[in-house]
Regions:
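FAD-site-proximal beta/loop scaffold in flavoenzymes
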Residues: 1-25, 116-183
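Residue-level detector of alpha-helix initiation sites
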Residues: 34-38, 179-180
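Rossmann-like dinucleotide-binding cores of NAD(P)H-dependent redox enzymes
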Residues: 38-97
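A structured beta-alpha segment of the ubiquitous adenosine-cofactor-binding alpha/beta core
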Residues: 17-19, 81-88, 92-130
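Beta1/beta-strand and adjacent pyrophosphate-binding region of the FAD-binding site
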Residues: 23-34
Length: 197
């Protein structure tokens, strides 16, 4: 994500060569609910954004009901320190459109969702938006590549299914990191390699 890459350059005292993306004095909307979205929220707050909103489709109850299989692994997000710095997290929201003038965005249009992720009638709303950041991650690794050619078994989320030693359903083929667990932190991927046998 260019926004975070640029800030990492600034943090190291390096020059940002491309057009700068800054949140200073802006109404910022971050779309997505994972670690990258949280990093965007924190960065925008620290850059002096006027307002920062994080929007995600999932509900708080949906997150809690998934258990350790997925949301349990990221339950720490509910008490994420970045939101102690500021920012507003909105659950069960579906962005529907952006609007603006002369090619410049100034509003996000959205609608609230029910527990089945269906739109709630007459729940449309707008948020002022000067900068929109999409931190949506990915659903699963691409299946139409080597994974498909090898015929490895996939789990219910479309990730490569493994046992506790990271062995796939194909003898001699192992999987670690995001392709096995879904999008996560690089340190977890590095840790995965230690249990490959």
């Amino acid at each position: 994500m260019d926004y975070l890459k640029q800030q990492n350059k600034r943090n190291r005292g390096l020059e940002v060569d491309e057009d700068e993306i800054l949140a200073t004095n802006k109404n910022v909307i971050v779309i997505g609910g994972g670690d990258t979205a949280n990093d965007c929220v924190g960065t925008a707050i620290r850059q002096g954004a006027k307002n920062v909103y994080q929007l995600q489709r999932s509900s708080e109850s949906e997150r809690d009901s998934k258990g350790a299989s997925f949301w349990g692994k990221i339950s720490a997000m509910t008490k994420n320190p970045v939101f102690e710095e500021g920012g507003i997290r909105e659950y069960s929201v579906k962005p529907t459109a952006f609007s603006g003038e002369a090619g410049i965005v100034n509003k996000l249009h959205a609608i609230k969702l029910d527990e089945n992720r269906e739109e709630i009638a007459d729940s449309d709303f707008e948020i002022e938006c000067d900068l929109a950041l999409f931190a949506l991650g990915f659903l699963h690794p691409e299946h139409e590549t080597l994974l498909g050619d090898l015929g490895v078994e996939l789990d219910e989320r479309g990730n490569v299914k493994t046992d506790e030693f990271k062995r796939t359903s194909v003898k001699g083929v192992y999987a670690a990191g995001d392709m096995r667990s879904g999008q996560s932190l690089v340190c977890k991927a590095i840790s995965d390699r230690k249990s490959v046998v």
